[in-house]
Design a protein with these regions (language model features):
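Residue-level marker of regulatory loop/turn positions in helix-turn-helix DNA-binding domains and
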Residues: 5, 25, 44, 66
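Short amphipathic alpha-helical interaction segments
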Residues: 41-57
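A short, conserved structural fragment
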Residues: 56-66
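Short, amphipathic alpha-helical interaction segments positioned at domain boundaries
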Residues: 76-82
Length: 82
């Protein structure tokens, strides 16, 4: 079953939750490149970009664009997952 943007946002926040993320914690690159992104189809990979932009627009995380995006939890994001 294909993931939509909502599912991808939930996956990202769930991963921060699983690592008991606090403000300024960064999602481990190895999780993204080894355990998550390889399992997304091309459409889901496009939605991944949209999902992180939406999470950033809502103030839940900050991200630096790159081959592997750097996702950093904000205070608002930390409050959401706890």
């Amino acid at each position: 079953m294909s993931k939509d943007i909502k599912d991808i946002k939930k996956d990202i926040l769930d991963q921060f939750r699983a690592m008991e993320g606090e403000e300024n914690d960064i999602l481990p690159e190895n999780w993204l490149i080894e355990e998550y992104l390889p399992f997304l189809n091309p459409y889901e990979k496009k939605d991944f970009e949209k999902a992180i932009k939406q999470l950033a627009a809502k103030g839940f995380l900050k991200y630096e664009k790159g081959v592997i995006p750097k996702l950093k939890l904000t205070e608002k994001g930390a409050n959401l997952i706890h």
